[in-house]
Amino acid sequence: MRTKKLPALRVGVGGPVGSGKTTLLEMLCKAMRERYDLVAITNDIYTKEDQRLLTISGALPAERIMGVETGGCPHTAIREDASINLEAVDRMLAKFPDADVVFIESGGDNLAATFSPELSDLTIYVIDVAGGEKIPRKGGPGITKSDLLIINKTDLAPYVGASLEVMESDTRKMRGDRPFVMCNLRAQGGLDEVIRFIERQGMLAA
């Protein structure tokens, strides 16, 4: 727990469709909810499917999860015109003023997606092995500039002909000293490392 009250930490989670963003949010919420006061905001273009999935998974009580329909390019709603998400954050913090963390999941987007610094204090970008071992070296702000990069679904590497060693090497070249984690989120592989990063960088831990 935090030793003193600070403004809620806003953690943006981005990445392509199907990379594991909603799974990451579910796992983070279930692992952290006993220690921290959490709320979550999900973005979808025309539905609130990710909100529904988070709710039925029991990640958080339904009133602590808000779905936002962006109605257009999901990148715009987290970067160029983040007003719809900034309003959602304000509404959630009005309901839960003691929240320690606000998770904000972007809609699925391409490698160019980034969060506005107005919206997110920490950015986590999720890619997955099933997209091919070439993904890290394609670059883009999500891969090169995010605070933490997650390479998810490492268990699928043998089935898609991807080399985890090549992906790790390419990621180091693209990110320099910026951290990344190899994960199998469905089995909670790498989850503890992600939580430690959030606690350390977000100044949550005592």
UniProtKB/Swiss-Prot annotation:
Q: Which UniProt keywords apply?
A: Chaperone, Cytoplasm, GTP-binding, Nickel insertion, Nucleotide-binding
One Pfam family matching this protein: cobW
GO biological process terms, alphabetically, are: urea catabolic process
MF terms from GO for this chain are: GTP binding; GTPase activity; nickel cation binding
Compartment annotation:
Cytoplasm
The main location is: cytoplasm
Described by its record, this protein's role is as follows: Facilitates the functional incorporation of the urease nickel metallocenter. This process requires GTP hydrolysis, probably effectuated by UreG.
Quaternary structure annotation from Swiss-Prot or TrEMBL: Homodimer. UreD, UreF and UreG form a complex that acts as a GTP-hydrolysis-dependent molecular chaperone, activating the urease apoprotein by helping to assemble the nickel containing metallocenter of UreC. The UreE protein probably delivers the nickel.
Give the family, as the similarity comment puts it.
Belongs to the SIMIBI class G3E GTPase family. UreG subfamily.
What name has this protein been given in UniProt? Urease accessory protein UreG
Q: Which organism is it from?
A: Ralstonia pickettii (strain 12J)
User: Quick one: which gene encodes this?
Assistant: ureG
